[in-house]
């Protein structure tokens, strides 16, 4: 059961850096719905992409799976036999709840839930990889190496879904979308104190990139095609395609 997010409703004397701990995991479904515009749409459409790209006898990776929302969306939409989903997160609290969520919904496609560092996971025989608001929590210097590894592990015709919070090279546009996101959180019941305290905790651990920077990394990794397929304010999702025809 998810609880309402009130983690930052009272002043916190010492704000440390953000962690996906037990307290965050407990309120995460409410938190992300009220904080990330378009999140439900992205989750639903990841399932639609899975229906299009997942191939029989291949694997799907959900890297930074949190509570398993993207994993479940993929599994509901797989139309082939002998597929497997590997869901990975480094937060013990998230993984514990993810396993419970996955087990609560029965489906023929098996899911392996792994507690671990996504940088250490071997990607192989993949028809689809999902990075749903995950890359932004890696050090910028480590992001290219992960994308390189994903590209190598994808089969020809495979797809990477990369959802992120964006920064903008045009400062005026960036300010507008930042303020609209602020309005979105206020409209969802967050106070100025809650918004400010959460932002202070995230600013050192969530480092955002522009869409242009993401596309440049994807090209460098080898992806022949990439495009923004969803955006709401300063949040969105890209799809990157590996050339070739799925076997």
UniProtKB/Swiss-Prot annotation:
Q: What class of enzyme is it?
A: transferase
Kindly give the SUPFAM superfamilies that the UniProt entry links to this protein. Answer: S-adenosyl-L-methionine-dependent methyltransferases (SSF53335)
Give the Gene Ontology MF terms in alphabetical order.
carboxyl- or carbamoyltransferase activity; S-adenosyl-L-methionine binding
- InterPro entries of this UniProt entry? CmoA (IPR005271), Methyltransf_25 (IPR041698), SAM-dependent_MTases_sf (IPR029063)
Q: Which reaction does it catalyse?
A: prephenate + S-adenosyl-L-methionine = carboxy-S-adenosyl-L-methionine + 3-phenylpyruvate + H2O
Q: Which Gene3D superfamilies match?
A: Vaccinia Virus protein VP39 (3.40.50.150)
Report the EC number(s), separated by commas if there are several. 2.1.3.-
Q: Where does S-adenosyl-L-methionine bind?
A: 39, 64-66, 89-90, 117-118, 132, 199
Kindly state which keywords UniProt assigns to this record, in alphabetical order: S-adenosyl-L-methionine, Transferase
Q: Which GO terms describe its biological process?
A: tRNA wobble uridine modification
Q: Does the keyword 4Fe-4S apply?
A: no
Q: Which cysteines are joined by disulfide bonds?
A: none
The Swiss-Prot or TrEMBL record describes its family as follows:
Belongs to the class I-like SAM-binding methyltransferase superfamily. Cx-SAM synthase family.
Outline what the protein does: Catalyzes the conversion of S-adenosyl-L-methionine (SAM) to carboxy-S-adenosyl-L-methionine (Cx-SAM).
On assembly, the entry states:
Homodimer.
Q: What is this protein called?
A: Carboxy-S-adenosyl-L-methionine synthase
Q: Which organism is it from?
A: Salmonella newport (strain SL254)
